[in-house]
């Protein structure tokens, strides 16, 4: 497995195109999210900017098998703009020391998991998360914040990551979701 972390301009055009197609396949086709995606790939959407950071995992054949997006909370980000209610009245983080981790996926389409918990706890997902933490730390982050399904909390702790809730879980679109802080 090869994992690359960097800003969009650090990726070749070919890899970035494969990455957008992978995200479309995961989030639109596999998870059923309703996103405006022409040409069966995710184009730059609300939080994808030139200075957005990504983590991309590839297998030995260079197929993408996982990804994540990283944004400093000093610019608009998913939790702060779309799901602030998950913070339970806490001020929306806005600090170069807190980065948002979003669009996290660890789906290897050559052998998809039988459950979402397997996808989150797989060696691929642990490696992607560790690389995201390392990259964010290099940028000066001390914490990551995510919008996550509740089961992720238990899996993060089981994998040895220091994580805690930023607010109580809430039902969003039929899922028990929470804001999770992960120490970097």
UniProtKB/Swiss-Prot annotation:
<dbReference type="GO" id="GO:0009372">
    <property type="term" value="P:quorum sensing"/>
</dbReference>
<dbReference type="GO" id="GO:0061579">
    <property type="term" value="F:N-acyl homoserine lactone synthase activity"/>
</dbReference>
<dbReference type="InterPro" id="IPR016181">
    <property type="entry name" value="Acyl_CoA_acyltransferase"/>
</dbReference>
<keyword id="KW-0071">Autoinducer synthesis</keyword>
<dbReference type="InterPro" id="IPR001690">
    <property type="entry name" value="Autoind_synthase"/>
</dbReference>
<keyword id="KW-0808">Transferase</keyword>
<comment type="function">
    <text>Involved in the synthesis of the acyl-homoserine lactone (AHL) signal N-(3-hydroxydodecanoyl)-L-HSL (3-hydroxy-C(12)-HSL or OH-dDHL). Required for normal biofilm development.</text>
</comment>
<protein>
    <recommendedName>
        <fullName>Acyl-homoserine-lactone synthase</fullName>
        <ecNumber>2.3.1.184</ecNumber>
    </recommendedName>
</protein>
<comment type="similarity">
    <text>Belongs to the autoinducer synthase family.</text>
</comment>
<dbReference type="Pfam" id="PF00765">
    <property type="entry name" value="Autoind_synth"/>
</dbReference>
<dbReference type="GO" id="GO:0007165">
    <property type="term" value="P:signal transduction"/>
</dbReference>
<keyword id="KW-0673">Quorum sensing</keyword>
<keyword id="KW-0949">S-adenosyl-L-methionine</keyword>
